[in-house]
C-alpha cells in the first residue's frame, strides 16, 4: 500500500526508519526522531527564506573550492541511533559536510554534519531547541547554530567533551564567527534586515 497521507500512519508509535521514510509519498514534510514522526512547519515565512538564502550565499562563497560542501533544506541527514538503526532523519535549514564518505550514496548525509544551522520559525522553535538540539548533540554535530529572526541573534553551540557549550549570543550589528571554521565570519547585518 502506498502511503500518501499522514492519516495513514500511526503518529503515536515509534519504530519508523529511513527505509520506511523513503517509501512514503507524503505532501507534508516530516522528520524522524528516534523513530517517531514529526511534522515540519508548512512553507517558511519570507523572513525565514531571506535569512536562509543569505546564509546559503555566505556559506557557498566561503566553501567554494574547498573540500567541505554546503546543503540546504530539503536535504536528508540520517543520524543513526547508538544501536545503528537509521531512525533519525532530519532536514536542517543548512548544513556543512566535510567527510565525502557521508555523502557516498548520492542521496543523503549518513552521519553527523560538521555544522548545522536551524532558523527558528513560529511552530518549530520547541522542536529545534529541544528534540533536535539533543539529537545533534548525541550525534556529535561539532557546531550548531540557532538563528532567531525575531530577536535578530544567533546562538552558537559547540561540542565540548560530548556536550554542547553555548557561546555568548551574537546580536544584531556583530560578527558571527564559526568555531569549527575560524576563518568563516559573517556580519549579522548581512543576514538580518
Summary of predicted features, one role per range:
Residues 1-193:
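Gly/Pro/Ser/Thr-rich low-complexity, intrinsically disordered segments predominantly at protein N-termini
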Amino acid at each position: 500500500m502506498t502511503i500518501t497521507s499522514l492519516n495513514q500512519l500511526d503518529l503515536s508509535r515509534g519504530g519508523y526508519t529511513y527505509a520506511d521514510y523513503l517509501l512514503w509519498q507524503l505532501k507534508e514534510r516530516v522528520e524522524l526522531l528516534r523513530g517517531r514522526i514529526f511534522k515540519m512547519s508548512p512553507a517558511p515565512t519570507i523572513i525565514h527564506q531571506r535569512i536562509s538564502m543569505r546564509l546559503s550565499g555566505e556559506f557557498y562563497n566561503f566553501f567554494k573550492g574547498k573540500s567541505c560542501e554546503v546543503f540546504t533544506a530539503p536535504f536528508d541527514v540520517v543520524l543513526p541511533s547508538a544501536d545503528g538503526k537509521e531512525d533519525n532523519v532530519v532536514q536542517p535549514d543548512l548544513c556543512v559536510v566535510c567527510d565525502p564518505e557521508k555523502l557516498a550514496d548520492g542521496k543523503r548525509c549518513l552521519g553527523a554534519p560538521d555544522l548545522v544551522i536551524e532558523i527558528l520559525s513560529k511552530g518549530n522553535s520547541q522542536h529545534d531547541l529541544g528534540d533536535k538540539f539533543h539529537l545533534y548533540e548525541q550525534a556529535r554535530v561539532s557546531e550548531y547554530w540557532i538563528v532567531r529572526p525575531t530577536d535578530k541573534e544567533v546562538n552558537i553551540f559547540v561540542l565540548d567533551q560530548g556536550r554542547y557549550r553555548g557561546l555568548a549570543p551574537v546580536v544584531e550589528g556583530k560578527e558571527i564567527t564559526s568555531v569549527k571554521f575560524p576563518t568563516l565570519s559573517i556580519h549579522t547585518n548581512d543576514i538580518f534586515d
